[in-house]
Amino acid sequence: MTRVVLSVGSNLGDRLARLRSVADGLGDALIAASPIYEADPWGGVEQGQFLNAVLIADDPTCEPREWLRRAQEFERAAGRVRGQRWGPRNLDVDLIACYQTSATEALVEVTARENHLTLPHPLAHLRAFVLIPWIAVDPTAQLTVAGCPRPVTRLLAELEPADRDSVRLFRPSFDLNSRHPVSRAPES
């Protein structure tokens, strides 16, 4: 089994529908969805505000490369064209972390540094728009940074207050449909 933590964001068109398309596309693999947050753009490019959320999914058939392929397919289906770095996005789907079940059934974080796949996401620990929704859906989450697992709550506390304040609750529940209850927390 592999579990994935996905960060989804959109600042063009029907932002909420774009986020919903990913949750719908995950189907029964979706096990948890954060509330939706509105966030100032990150990276210094002038543009509209983003809607962001974190989705957690499990699928025994997906290896990390397959999760990447699925994320890119969600983006293509939304009409995403890769252009300006950190520019406006119809839809952005980032793999933040992947976990595989060990022989003892514990979840083990996957690390990868290969063509177009870096896990965990190398900038996730610097992005309040990733950390805040992730904590909302999994308060005990950890992320490996510089080779050491760190509580996501600690990573968020280390960010500047202005970064944390740039992320505001937009909708308290993801409210996608009745198939995906928000309250179902991931198992660890």
Curated annotation (Swiss-Prot):
Q: Does the keyword Kinase apply?
A: yes
Which UniProt keyword terms apply here? ATP-binding, Folate biosynthesis, Kinase, Nucleotide-binding, Transferase
Q: Top EC class per UniProt?
A: transferase
UniProt entry tagged with the keyword Ubl conjugation: no
GO terms for MF: 2-amino-4-hydroxy-6-hydroxymethyldihydropteridine diphosphokinase activity; ATP binding; kinase activity
Family annotation (PROSITE patterns): HPPK (PS00794)
Its function, per the record, reads: Catalyzes the transfer of pyrophosphate from adenosine triphosphate (ATP) to 6-hydroxymethyl-7,8-dihydropterin, an enzymatic step in folate biosynthesis pathway.
Q: What name appears for this protein in its UniProt entry?
A: 2-amino-4-hydroxy-6-hydroxymethyldihydropteridine pyrophosphokinase
Organism per entry: Mycobacterium bovis (strain ATCC BAA-935 / AF2122/97)
